[in-house]
Regions:
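Bacterial N-terminal signal peptides
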Residues: 11-22
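N-terminal secretory signal peptides that target proteins for export/translocation
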Residues: 1-8
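Flexible, surface-exposed loop/linker segments and immediately adjacent secondary-structure boundaries
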Residues: 29-177
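Sec/Tat signal peptide C-region and signal peptidase I cleavage site
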Residues: 22-28
Length: 177
């Protein structure tokens, strides 16, 4: 790994970027991923080994994570804005997780969106199932297609809701879907 890559990796891991965080293309490739800009938008598509695809909303602040240090991305720390994730069944042994300040959303073989804004994390499932819990709690909920949950700081129970079409459409439009 070059000195430049080590430098950017240390910044990424320490979470020292201010403002908009863009994952360095060389680091993404080192983790088995490649970025592609979406023409005419501020969105990017991150395609990783094993078929994982992440559509990144413009202005998102996130960090790619290799929890088991096998050279493949298996989690994302999301701090701002939203990601639309598609992790085909069996693509990531042990599943894929999105960690936010308010929640952990973990899935296998699914398509889901995670949005962080104004002290709240919202998770919505399009396909498959996603387990959601607060970082400091093992109690959580499991979302099915069409289900969503809004997680705010605190210890109260999480409430699964069927999201109205208007809310789903507004979220997916942010990803060009």
């Amino acid at each position: 790994m070059s000195a430049r890559d080590r430098f950017f990796r240390s910044l990424m891991m320490a979470g020292l970027f201010a403002g908009v965080f863009w994952v360095d293309a060389a680091l993404a490739q080192g983790a088995g991923c490649a970025f592609a800009p979406v023409a005419g938008t501020s969105r990017q598509i991150l395609r990783c080994q094993e078929g994982l695809t992440i559509i990144v909303e413009g202005g998102s602040r996130f960090t790619l994570v290799d929890r088991d240090r096998n050279g493949k991305v298996d989690a994302v720390r999301l701090r701002r804005k939203a990601l639309l994730l598609d992790a085909p069944a069996g693509s990531i042994p042990g599943g894929f997780a999105v960690v936010t300040p308010q929640a952990i959303a973990a899935a296998r073989g699914t398509k889901w969106a995670v949005d962080v804004a104004r002290g709240k994390t919202s998770v919505f499932v399009l396909r498959g199932r996603v387990a959601v819990n607060r970082p400091a709690s093992s109690a959580g909920v499991v979302l099915a297609p069409g289900d969503g949950v809004d997680v705010e700081a605190g210890t109260g129970p999480l409430t699964v809701k069927r999201w109205p079409a208007k809310r789903v459409s507004a979220l997916l439009a942010r990803f060009g879907q």
